[in-house]
Amino acid sequence: MIKKKKKKSYTSVYALGQYISMSTHKARRVIDQIRGRSYEEALMILELMPYRGCYPIFKLVYSAAANASHNKGFKETNLVISKAEVNQGNTVKKLKPRARGRSYPIKRPTCHITIVLEDRSFDQQYDEYLMYLKNPGYRNAKINLPCYETYSSGGLWDKK
């Protein structure tokens, strides 16, 4: 099996929660609501949703933001949840004692949750820089536009 090398990302950070005792279906129901949203908006949504799976996901999103601000110095206002995935973990099997010496099996599903946050401020700066490289008069065009309109309309010049 050939493994791909992961590129080092300078604009994203992640938090990984493993063996969270919750069904993957129930966790995905919550994760689908916050995928692609900003960090602050996701926290508000997670606080107000009535599901039991919201609290572990809330802690993971908060931890990923703490990683972003501490390790890479990102501002929390620019963070966006770029990737959020839920994978199935091990199933913990227990025996519940019942009447007359019998026992019933109990299955506790677990899941692994990955939250990836991305800093959007770098993308905006990069896009502006590319526009500047493609068109050197990019910023000056915005400034000189009103003057050009006044001259082209014939307001100031009295041409014959």
Swiss-Prot record:
Localization (cell): Plastid, Chloroplast
GO cellular component: chloroplast; large ribosomal subunit
Protein name as it appears in the record: Large ribosomal subunit protein uL22c
Subunit annotation: Part of the 50S ribosomal subunit.
One Pfam family matching this protein: Ribosomal_L22
Record Gene3D superfamilies: Ribosomal protein L22/L17 (3.90.470.10)
Keywords: Chloroplast, Plastid, Ribonucleoprotein, Ribosomal protein, RNA-binding, rRNA-binding
Function, as annotated: This protein binds specifically to 23S rRNA. The globular domain of the protein is located near the polypeptide exit tunnel on the outside of the subunit, while an extended beta-hairpin is found that lines the wall of the exit tunnel in the center of the 70S ribosome.
Any one biological process term the GO annotation gives: translation
Alphabetical list of CDD domains matching this protein: Ribosomal_L22 (cd00336)
Entry's family note: Belongs to the universal ribosomal protein uL22 family.
InterPro entries: Ribosomal_uL22 (IPR001063), Ribosomal_uL22_bac/chlpt-type (IPR005727), Ribosomal_uL22_bac/org-type (IPR047867), Ribosomal_uL22_CS (IPR018260), Ribosomal_uL22_sf (IPR036394)
Any one GO molecular function term: structural constituent of ribosome
Keyword Ribosomal protein: yes
Signal peptide limits: none
Record flagged with keyword Transferase: no
